[in-house]
């Protein structure tokens, strides 16, 4: 088995690798969508609207846009020099994680999920 990152954690990997995918492990930033109430809702809406599985980075992009939009709304402007100080105070219950920043702008609580291919499917390891 191989340990990989989020780019390996796809249905396409299992499709291409076939039975050889069994036992491979992949890490993904954030929480598994199915483990977060808003994540499940996002996945359902995405599939209904686009008639396909969620793209690899779509959930992270969605969270990033929501955080920046919230900061712009609170700042009352889109001017970066006025949005940035507000951004550091944002607390957002996202679909991939609870998002908050420290004084240097880093995530306060980075999260990682680990999956393993079992019976031809990615399964979240506890």
Where are these regions (language model features)?
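Extracytosolic ligand-binding ectodomains
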Residues: 1-126
């Amino acid at each position: 088995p191989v340990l990989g990152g989020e780019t390996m954690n796809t249905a396409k990997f299992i499709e291409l690798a076939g039975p050889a995918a069994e036992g491979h492990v992949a890490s993904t930033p954030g929480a598994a969508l199915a483990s977060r109430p808003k994540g499940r809702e996002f996945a359902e809406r995405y599939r209904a609207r686009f008639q396909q599985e969620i793209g690899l980075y779509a959930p992270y992009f969605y969270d990033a846009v929501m955080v920046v939009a919230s900061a712009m709304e609170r700042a009352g402007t889109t001017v970066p020099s006025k949005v940035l100080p507000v951004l550091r105070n944002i607390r957002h219950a996202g679909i991939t994680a609870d998002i908050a920043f420290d004084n240097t702008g880093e995530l306060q609580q980075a999260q990682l999920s680990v999956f393993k291919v079992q019976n031809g499917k990615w399964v979240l390891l506890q």
